[in-house]
Amino acid sequence: MEEQARPPGRPAASATLQGSAHPGGAASTATAAALSFSSVATVTLGNQSDAGRPEAAGSRGPAPLLWHGAAVAAQALVLLLIFLLSSLGNCAVMGVIVKHRQLRTVTNAFILSLSLSDLLTALLCLPAAFLDLFAPPGDSGPWRSFCAASRFFSSCFGIVSTFSVALISLDRYCAIVRPPRDKLGRRRALQLLAGAWLAALGFSLPWDLLRAPREPPAPQSFHRCLYRTSPDPAQLGVAYSVGLVVACYLLPFLLMCFCRYHICKTVRLSDVRVRPMTTYARVLRFFSEVRTATTVLIMIIFVMCCWGPYCFLVLLAATRQGQATQAPSLLNVAAVWLTWANGAINPVIYAIRNPNISMLLGRNREEGYRTRNMDAFLPSQGLGFQARSRNRLRNGCANRLGACSRMPSSNPASGSGGEVVMWARKNPVVLFFREGPPDSVMEVGKLHNSETRDSSI
């Protein structure tokens, strides 16, 4: 009688297969497929928290060990690739911005904050993932504090990255949509950056360790501690977890979409209303703003794709209210790795959108650059050469950019020439973002009275 009163336990895999009414039916096939996917996911995850239990260790045969080793090697290779791209790429971006004074603009300050947060994520969070791959299963033991610190850094720098991209979108919105007097100044940019870092620090503090837990924490493995969603709804409550996701991720995502929508609307209206462009500085500025807006759009898409699954899992854990008692699934691991991969994707975007980045890294201001940026070259030349270069650039833009096809050409022979490539010795190429063309370039555009007015942004 006592045995009949005991609550039924979870049936074994073999019992599940044998207990189906029709062994050859659809239910048996679906169950077998689910069990096969579960076994593959268990091997792929590496050091699972359930691997430390005796029944799990005894069921592992020699064949799964080979798959386990291959899975660990593949995971280590992916983590190494993310680490190298994040560390080296973001160091290069930060070095370019800090090295050249002309690149120290307001938008590049937000880029610097984004690169710094991605670099710190690679240096302080990825080592814990490497340790999890090769650490023995079982209780985390002495690594419990290291695991909590890694989760804190991952959450803090992730929030900073999201805020930085939102600030970049806001800066581009003010530069393109709003009047020039509404642009973000350096002082306001520093205040926004300081507020973003302080807010990320406050939201990411391990409040579950500073307050008395609702229930004694159960022993957990290093893998379960590392890939547990942060914040944990089981420890901090559902309201806090949902509020953090909304304030730190969903609202910045909405701000990015709002800014991007108005930027696209303004660019489309400007493309329709603009007259034939006759000033090369206006041409450069217009297409520079469009290219910048496209780069920001690419960054926004990758941020949403990398952080969207993580936010969804946090909200899902909040609805279940049982995160602390569950082992991290394959989706948890993939979501955390996607957030880390976002820091490696951003430098790749910069390199693709700015192919001359190696020249900025290899040369200083005194040595000069081989550049297509006329703004960096013409101010150091005479007025006669500036007038001739203006005509050549005008014809080059007419060939490359269809919007400039109606510009008058004073040098037909140069119309078939390729891109204008100069050697600039004074000013570096503004690869990332700039606030507007230099004053000396605008003075060149004022040589003719008919070129002083333009309706482009």
Swiss-Prot record:
Organism: Mus musculus (Mouse)
Gene that this sequence comes from: Gpr135
GO molecular function annotations of the record: arrestin family protein binding; G protein-coupled receptor activity
Pfam families from the UniProt entry: 7tm_1 (PF00001)
Residues carrying covalently attached carbohydrate according to the record: N47
Alphabetized PANTHER family for the sequence: G PROTEIN-COUPLED RECEPTOR, G-PROTEIN COUPLED RECEPTOR 135
Domain of life of the organism encoding this protein: Eukaryota
UniProt main location, coarse: membrane
Protein name: G-protein coupled receptor 135
Membrane topology of this protein: Multi-pass membrane protein
Function: Orphan receptor. Has spontaneous activity for beta-arrestin recruitment. Shows a reciprocal regulatory interaction with the melatonin receptor MTNR1B most likely through receptor heteromerization.
Ranges of the Extracellular topological domain: 1-64, 131-156, 211-235, 317-329
UniProt subcellular location: Cell membrane; Endosome membrane
